[in-house]
C-alpha cells in the first residue's frame, strides 16, 4: 500500500525532531511503525499528511521559513485522526519518498485550486502570506469577512515593519 501526501520541514529540510531529509531520497525505519515519536534515536515512522494545510500543525509557517514536500509513504502505514482538533488522514509510514519540494507558488496554488474554503482558511492561519498573496484568496468560495481579518493583520504588520 502506498499513500500520497505532504510533509513540512524547516528551511534546512529538517523535521521537528531534527532529522534532515533530501528531495529525491527514500527513508526507511526498521522499528514498529506508530504515530508519535519515541525518545532516543528510534524513528517509529515518517509522518506526513494527506492535506497540505494540515502539515502546518507541525511547523511554524507564520514566523519561520518552511518547506513543504510532496511525498509517498509505503510499507506499513498507520493512520491517525485527531477528531478533537479536526485533523484527519495523518500518517506514519515505514518508508517515505521525498518526491518534490514545492515552490511557494506551487504551495499557494494547490490550496487555491482545491476549492475548499475550510482548507484555505486553515492554510491562511498557518502560513505567512503577503498582502498580494492573500488577495488571490478573494474568491466566491472564501468568506470575505474571514479573509478581511487576515488582510487587516498583514497590513498592520507591514506598517509596523516600516516604522
What are the residue ranges of the model-derived segments?
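Short, glycine-biased loop/turn motifs at secondary-structure junctions and
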Residues: 1-163
Amino acid at each position: 500500500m502506498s499513500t500520497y501526501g505532504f510533509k513540512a520541514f524547516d528551511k534546512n529540510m529538517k523535521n521537528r525532531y531534527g532529522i534532515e531529509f533530501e528531495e529525491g531520497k527514500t527513508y526507511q525505519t526498521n522499528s514498529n511503525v506508530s504515530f508519535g515519536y519515541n525518545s532516543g534515536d528510534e524513528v517509529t515512522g515518517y509522518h506526513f499528511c494527506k492535506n497540505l494545510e494540515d502539515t502546518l500543525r507541525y511547523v511554524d509557517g507564520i514566523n519561520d521559513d518552511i518547506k513543504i514536500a510532496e511525498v509517498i509513504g509505503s510499507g506499513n502505514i498507520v493512520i491517525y485522526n485527531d477528531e478533537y482538533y479536526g485533523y484527519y488522514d495523518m500518517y506514519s509510514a515505514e518508508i517515505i519518498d521525498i518526491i518534490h519540494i514545492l515552490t511557494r507558488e506551487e504551495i499557494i496554488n494547490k490550496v487555491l485550486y482545491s476549492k475548499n474554503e475550510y482548507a484555505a482558511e486553515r492554510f491562511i492561519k498557518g502560513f505567512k502570506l503577503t498582502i498580494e498573496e492573500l488577495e488571490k484568496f478573494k474568491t466566491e468560495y472564501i468568506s470575505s469577512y474571514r479573509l478581511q481579518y487576515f488582510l487587516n493583520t498583514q497590513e498592520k504588520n507591514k506598517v509596523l515593519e516600516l516604522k
